[in-house]
Regions:
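Hydrophobic alpha-helical signal/anchor motif
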Residues: 2-3, 9-15, 19, 24-29
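Hydrophobic alpha-helical packing residues
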Residues: 71, 210-217, 248, 277, ...
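Conserved, mostly hydrophobic/aromatic
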Residues: 71, 103, 138, 180, ...
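Non-catalytic, usually N-terminal nucleic-acid engagement modules in DNA/RNA processing proteins
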Residues: 40-223, 335-338
Length: 441
């Protein structure tokens, strides 16, 4: 039996076989390559549909299947970030071979360059970037509000100046919907006001505006083949988060995101808000934690009922010589790796670990060779996708609590200074990362 948002239904055919065998864990955008699963493509499905496959008995973790017009997305899942219609240094074929079923693209950046109208005339974002998997687009709100002095906000919308040429732009809920419909993503996000998490007065004001904008987005959204997710805001204040969840669930979006986290609050505060907020969201709809994507945050987020994650962290760190291992981050610039013949991670099946040593990767990083950026990115994305697969398997087999304890006890979490998306040690002052403050990957 699989639980949906309507009623329990018995699956039939290949999808049922995949779920019954626990092999939902392997479903990707090309499921025929994984464990022999023959899953039909859902080419004419009107929008996203979420199936809750299995719950963990010892936590809020769950396994699900998100149906999109561009294939099945097993959850929990990590979405690589392709800000400008590309995951930096990787091709769509790379992502396919890594097993990524869904990526995120950025509305703000694509609206400014090359323009959503241009992309629409060229057949939409999937065709434009030659990606046949699912795409989630944000509304552009986070990038606009990160401009700080370059924007002005009112109930009508937000006026801002382009970081590219200084031109004045105006973004409203209706325009955010129009742009995302032109892009043709599988999942679109409402326009919301992103805030500093600790300022209660500002959060109260912004929350009212976020709810008004959510209603306007819902009225303006017209594409039947695109799911629109609401975004719960409210900073670190449980009562504001509860109010936001109440208002947005009443609007009956097909999915819900938790926004405004990992923007300055402590990890303990973030985890506490997730624990209190996730249970307030509909059980049979997907839950998306926006912009959060360190390995430990994936594990702790899944334990609290989150299904979907995205973050620039894995790709940004990779381009600056930092890679993930089972015991934490490795800084390949360290002299200790100068003659290290080992792969980044013993037993890792990614191309980088199958082929190259830490010593060689360190050489590429120090020599600033482009290949180093690519190989490190391949590993970090593989690590995140494999972590999601491992969690799906653990939930399916009833061993998630043991896995979580083992992972957290062995994984050395970066300190607070390094957690800020790789500032200082992990992110050298290079021009290629100078736009990190406006949400580039």
């Amino acid at each position: 039996m699989v639980v949906t948002g309507r009623q329990p239904v018995r699956q039939v055919g290949a999808v049922a076989q995949a779920v019954d065998a626990g092999r939902v864990l392997a479903v990707t955008i090309n499921p025929q390559q994984d464990a022999g699963i023959q899953v039909p493509r859902l080419t004419n499905q009107p929008s996203s549909c979420f199936e809750l496959v299995q719950r963990d008995s010892g936590s809020a973790a769950r396994v699900g299947l998100l149906h999109t017009p561009h294939g099945l997305v097993p959850t929990p899942i990590f979405c690589p970030v392709g800000t400008q219609a590309t995951v930096k240094t990787l091709s769509p074929q790379d992502l396919l071979e890594l097993g990524a079923p869904m990526i995120l693209a950025n509305t703000y950046h694509l609206y400014l360059r090359p323009g959503s109208a241009t992309i629409a005339r060229l057949g939409g974002l999937h065709r434009f970037m030659a990606w046949d998997g699912a795409i989630l687009t944000d509304s552009g709100g986070y990038q606009v509000f990160s401009l700080q002095t370059l924007r002005q906000v009112s109930d009508d919308g937000v006026t801002f100046r382009s970081h590219l040429d200084g031109s004045e732009q105006y973004l409203t809920p209706e325009k955010a919907m129009f742009i995302q419909e032109e892009l043709g993503s599988d999942i679109a996000m409402v326009l919301d006001e992103c805030t500093q998490p600790l300022d209660r007065a500002y959060n109260v004001q912004a929350l009212r505006r976020t709810h008004l904008w959510a209603e306007r987005c819902l009225r303006a959204h017209t594409r039947a083949d695109q799911a629109l997710f609401g975004i719960v805001q409210g900073g670190v204040f449980p009562d504001l988060r509860a109010e936001s969840a109440r208002v947005l669930t009443a609007l009956d979006f097909p999915g819900y995101a938790v926004g405004g986290l990992s923007v300055g609050e402590s990890k303990e505060q973030m985890y506490s808000i997730l624990e209190q907020t996730a249970p307030l969201l509909p059980e049979f709809k997907p839950r998306y934690l926006m912009g959060v994507g360190s390995p430990e945050d994936l594990v702790e987020g899944v334990a609290r009922g989150i299904d979907i994650f995205d973050c620039v962290l894995p790709t940004r760190l990779a381009r600056n010589g930092a890679v993930f291992g089972p015991e934490g981050r490795l800084n390949l610039r360290n002299a200790s790796y100068r003659e290290d013949p080992r792969p980044i991670q013993d037993g890792c099946t990614c191309y980088t670990c199958r082929t190259f040593s830490r010593a060689y990767l360190r050489h590429l990083v120090l020599a600033e060779e482009i290949l180093g950026l690519r190989l490190n990115t391949v590993h970090n994305i593989h690590f995140m996708l494999q972590l999601a697969r491992t969690m799906r398997l653990a939930i399916s087999e009833g061993t998630f609590s043991a896995f979580r304890h083992d992972f957290i006890s062995h994984y050395n979490v970066a300190n607070a200074d390094l957690r800020a998306e790789g500032h200082h040690t992990w992110r050298p002052s290079k021009p290629r990362d100078s736009k990190a403050s406006i949400g580039e990957d």
